[in-house]
């Protein structure tokens, strides 16, 4: 497939008060929630106005307590985070990692531990040897009713108007070992999973839906290597899914251009370009995205930690400083 955009960059847009200046953090233990609580005032003072808290299974779920992580954050902790974010005018968005990333290293996460029949590769890869991460089967009729209950609990606890559903790096999909998915089109399977969540979150619950964008990009045509784009057939899903989803378009290396930003914009999506720990790469991504700043669907910037926050983080993180300075004062 060809993923080419005719949308051309222009001069940096004027400063916009509504730019999202976001931070993605892992909040998967009680201690992580405590640190985030201490850091919220500092993050807000540094310019952060959106925090995406990746919780996944690490909340004291009531509907399915068997799916709680080892040290889940409590409802009371979430209530304090909500109050603090509201006080400091920070939008707090929970994240629940859907479809892929159902394991890490040798640890399989609660859903596939408690319900192994949901696994896309049932009975294969003992100790997760030989794979990156497990996935659940997008066609299993019993998986969505369970995970949607978890999403609903997070939305209610966080009093959230949006949910990030992850869906990055889904490498196991349409596998021959799955009796339901074998032989089926992987883009259609991926699109179905996305549309199922969209139906529940956006249409039924009336909240915004965010997701990572890498599996919607075709590595052969767009020029991204490695993890930033897909080579397993999921990319055509970009034309099969609702365009009111917010795409978090992550790129962690320095480049002259980032063609996925105009591609997603031209397709009709709102885009939140996303960086990690390389300050020069973050600056390059922010600067390139600002060439499309006159389009309000280019929402701003998201800085990721891919770990729990640390005390003093708000004063020390260079990517946060770069994003704040450039988005508030585009040159």
Language model features with spans:
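Hydrophobic faces of well-ordered beta-strands that scaffold small-molecule active sites
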Residues: 19-25, 51-53, 92-96, 163-165, ...
